[in-house]
Design a protein with these regions (language model features):
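Bacterial N-terminal signal peptides that target proteins for export
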Residues: 2-17
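Flexible loop/hinge segments at secondary-structure junctions
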Residues: 30-403
Length: 403
């Protein structure tokens, strides 16, 4: 792992990632205001207004409230930023989020050891059935992003990978960077005669779940030999824990390629491939191409959708929402109120941090659906996100796959 701590400041993440920073604890945030100049108290267009039960400048929780959460590493940099800034706005609310992977996050939420979980894959029916009936679960998409194939080839600034090529690399069938199939898609590229080292997630991972669901959708061979899931038996490669660990391993390993959330690659200056989409077009992962993908997907009423192989010439092929997991009912009224305030912040002021950190702001219609679902958690708080959130409402065309 990289040794220096990754710090979220006003405009960016520093260029080095560590597990410590991404498991960012806000228990000590009250004394760190001088280190972060981001203001979250001023009213801004699209942000929460005085229609909340407590008002935007004051959150009456009857004292200090601490929330604990655990789960996906995919949104961890963004959540860390949100929770840091939210603590500055409401010093009586402290949130500790541990980046442990989607699998562990779902498990800890189900067992009741945390107040909320996070997962890059919406919970399946069999997982929902394990949640205590008196608690229930809401799955709330809070942001979205691309999963990229980042690589370490110093002399190859750009790389195109056809669908059949990147699946064959991950299956171990293409073993060298100068393989004719890679060369054919990249004429003139200085592809080295070096072995390819695949880096994959060693922990239970929603990022892996999304990625392998896509691979299974486009490759019958992958589907039959490997399949999909938060953990799979990888045919080749080296495992690393978390998006943080995969990012570090790629950085340290010449000739490597691995899948990480776009923001991690962007903030750490990793190169990433253009991938061939369903329409046969090579698309570079950006906030814009991810937004194009989301515009082609209708999120159903239960807020669960799997985007496995999206339509559209401009769509990047591997994009996912990432979900916050909360109870429908909390026995502690103060925690219920705090959970709603946390969600409201994420849907309003927090969305403005999304593109900055490599994520995709929620379409306005999705933010409205999330607010409506979450507003039932506490009778003492009213989530207000305005008639138009500072997001880009898409024109939904294609339904997501429900489960």
């Amino acid at each position: 792992m990289l040794s220096r701590t990754s710090v979220i400041n006003k405009s960016r993440l520093t260029r080095t990632i560590s597990v410590l920073a991404l498991a960012f604890s806000l228990a000590a945030c009250g004394g760190q205001e001088a280190q972060n100049n981001t203001s979250t108290g001023d009213a801004t267009p699209g942000a929460a207004t005085d229609t909340t039960a407590s008002g935007p400048a004051k959150l009456d929780l009857g004292g200090k409230v601490s929330l604990t959460g655990a789960g996906a590493s995919f949104p961890a940099p963004l959540y860390s930023r949100w929770f840091f800034d939210l603590n500055k706005k409401y010093p009586n609310l402290q949130i500790n989020y541990q980046s442990v992977g989607s699998g562990a996050g779902v498990e800890q939420f189900t067992q009741g050891t945390v107040d909320f979980g996070a997962s890059d894959v919406a919970m399946k029916d069999e997982e929902i059935q394990k949640v205590p009936a008196d608690k229930g679960v809401l799955m709330l998409p809070m942001t979205a992003g691309s999963i990229v194939l980042a690589y370490n080839l110093p002399d190859v600034p750009e790389l195109k990978l056809p669908r059949a090529v990147y699946t064959d690399i991950l299956l171990g069938k293409i073993k060298s960077w100068n393989d004719p199939k890679i060369a054919a898609a990249n004429p003139g590229a200085k592809l080295p005669n070096e072995p390819i080292t695949v880096i994959y997630r060693s922990d239970g991972s929603g990022t892996t779940g999304v990625f392998t669901k896509h691979l299974s959708a486009i490759s019958p061979e992958w589907k039959s030999k490997v399949g999909e899931g938060k953990t799979v038996n990888w045919p080749v490669g080296v495992g690393a824990k978390g998006n943080e660990g995969v990012t570090a391993q790629i950085t340290q390993t010449p000739g490597s390629i691995g899948y990480v959330e776009y923001g991690y690659a962007k903030q750490n200056n990793l190169k990433y491939a253009s991938l061939e989409n369903k329409a046969g077009k090579f698309v570079v992962p950006t906030e814009e191409s991810a937004s194009k993908t989301l515009e082609a997907v209708t999120l159903p009423e239960n807020l669960r959708a799997f985007i496995t192989d999206p339509e559209g010439d401009e769509s990047y092929p591997i994009v996912t929402y990432t979900w916050l997991l909360t109870a429908k009912k909390y026995s502690d009224p103060a925690k219920a109120k705090a959970i709603e305030a946390m969600i409201e912040y994420g849907l309003t002021e927090g969305q403005k941090n999304a593109a900055e950190l490599g994520y995709v702001p929620l379409p306005a219609n999705v933010a409205q659906k999330v607010a409506a679902a979450a507003d039932a958690i506490s009778p003492d708080y009213k989530i207000a996100i305005g008639s138009s959130n500072n997001t880009s409402a898409g024109a939904p065309q294609q339904g997501g796959n429900n489960q």
